[in-house]
Amino acid sequence: MKYVEGFVENIIFRNEDNGYTVFNIVYDDEEITCVGVLSYINTGEFITAQGEFVKHAVYYMQFKVTSYEFRAPDDAASVRRYLSSGAIKGIGEKMAERIVKTFGDDTFRIMEEEPERLAEIKGISMSKAMDIANQLIDKKDIRKAMMFLQRYGIQMNLANKIFKRYGNDIYNILEQNPYRLADDIEGVGFRTADEIASRVGIKIDSEFRIKSGIFYVLNQATMQGHTYLPYDKLVRQVNELLLIDVQDYDKYLMDLTMDKKIVVKVKDNVKCVYARMYYNMEANVAAMLNNLDVQIEEDQKFIDDRIARIEDKEGITLDDIQKEAVAKAVRNGLVIVTGGPGTGKTTTINTIIKYFELEGLEIRRAAPTGRAAKRMTEACGYEAQTIHRMLEISGGVPDGDKKSAAAGLSMFFERNEDNPLEADVIIVDEMSMVDISIMNSLLKAVSIGTKLILVGDVDQLPSVGPGNVLKDIIESGCFPVVKLERIFRQAAQSEIIINAHKINRGEEVVLNKYSKDFLFVHRNGADNIINAMKTLIKDKLPDYVGADVYDLQILTPSRKSNVGVERLNKIMQDFLNPADAIKQERQVGDVTFREGDKVMQIKNDYQLAWEKRSRYGIPTEQGTGAFNGDTGVIERISTFDENVTVKFEDGRFVTYEFSQLDELELAYAITVHKSQGSEYPAVIIPMSQGPRMLMNRNILYTAVTRARKCVCLVGEEEIFRLMAGNVSESKRYSSLTDRIEEIRHIEDFGQ
């Protein structure tokens, strides 16, 4: 590490959100450009900075600051320079000259220890003197806090967050219970808090540590799709995390229950432990679904006649099950329509829409992702929105919503129980993708009396987020469900659809016969498989399906295998978008982002600003939010502004600071999970050995059904057979079914 010191000459750039600052310091006539997260430095201050010199592509040598210390001015010249800089509001150059002329080298001590004496100077009242003193105290408090936090290895950007949250309480919090940070500060997890606790000297069997570990494991479980964990599984994972053998878990669970952080329920003699937020979500969703489940009397002949009119006008013929779906949508406040590809879901939904249009009803259509909404729009001929957009997402939690803020929930929907959606009918497609959190937000915005129609394929993979909403609703048996199973004649001509249903039913799929849309390319070994995929994606498929290379998609079950996402993305990046002197790049860990790269947003960020632009680059629409699964292309990497601009498929431009690039990953290849709700002209699926838990029928079925015109399976036939025959799936712990049944049991008991 190297050190530099000097006066802060000027602030060139500062990002007010994350504190990233570019500034010059001067010492002995030498000027040095420094960069780093230094939210609280000001022009005129004298600092000593620790870090290293780095070479910038445009600005040559810069000093990258990792930590710094402020040195109080200790002579008249230094004080004059500091006060003249504008660091203290209310003091300009002339006033600074008067103050220094009066107090000389003793100026700074007097300002800190005897601020009332500043009132001796013409133009400074006693209230102004106290204001100057308070500003100095605030700055001193901030600097002291930064130094204190850095002693425990806390980086400056995180230190900024901590100080903004706690102020001068940080000393007691860090020394007594640093695990509070994991509860209160977005971006601080248990492991960070645990590292701080270790430095502070908190014992490994501390009550704070054990309770924080329990809560951390429960929250981590939600990232695996669970809304709760069985007691034994929770205990095992907490012991593995803490590296201790905790004896009396019941005591800590009782404490966390009393603190309203968790809920413990017994199901089939098994103790189930929930983070309270997710228990409440499932309970709320159950209650709101129950409220929407109302029945309406309507004459069957009237319904049949209206369906017949629609059939005649549209030139279609519905089968009995499709007609039943329309009738149930008419007679019920809530209905679920499920079925695989080619079973007539789109025709059924379009008929329902036409039926309600004849009633003069206001209809809203939505899907979980931009791609899914686009598919729904194209299929139905009516505009569909993402659920987030329909609910009018805002980039922050409402004032006073400390629970959401503490939980790290940075999204807020303008449409809710106080401002419901203005619609008579709401249709939501791709329901298998909807997690419990989004379902909770959606239902809050649906008024009793509004019809809700949920559409999806229950055999697809469940949502990436926690819960198993569609499956749980259907399995409860408490709401009207229509399952479409017949494959219609036009769909029956597609081997994609025929084979998808065969896979789902466990029937044999013939791979060695000629097919126009379901191809199997036999290759052995990962490298041979990848070489065949290269030929397909660049030379064969674009013309065959009439699509751009970037519109095709490689889908793979895993991230880490020889044909996993990470390896394939590196290989395909070099193949499809090789390095070039005119293309700017940015390295993030092991990944290089390059102008022209295909990328994907991998987490929901409700505060990212976006804009749409005219053909001349003029902004025409603005908003916030980029969502998990959004795909686009890197348009520009600016080393000057230190940001990356991505153009997403729906025309949104989003600019990411370099510090935000962990929200993106290359998307030449993506996991099957990430492809949910999307449809591509052609998909390429490697058939090579991978983790057994991912080599199953559910994954294969979902991957195959993502293709619109062509499926290309490349690899070993025995892997295909293994996946098609493996019906085991990762257990997902969810209990929406239980909450629904509890509501119904209470109602039945009341009657």
Language model segments and positions:
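Structural detector for short beta-strands of small beta-barrel domains
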Residues: M1-N15, G51, T631-E635
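Short aromatic-glycine-enriched beta-strand elements
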Residues: R14-I25, F640-T645
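Accessory alpha-helical DNA-binding modules that contact the DNA backbone or grooves
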Residues: Y20-D28, T33-C34, N42-E52, A57-K271, ...
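Loop/turn positions that initiate beta-strands
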Residues: G44-F46, G596, G629
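Pre-P-loop entry segment of helicase/translocase ATPase cores
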Residues: Q150, N219-Q220, V264-E324, G396-V397
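ASCE P-loop NTPase helicase motor core
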Residues: K323-V326, R331-K513
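Conserved helicase motor core of P-loop NTPases
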Residues: V458-T624, I743
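C-terminal accessory regions
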Residues: R505, E621-G623, N628-Q751
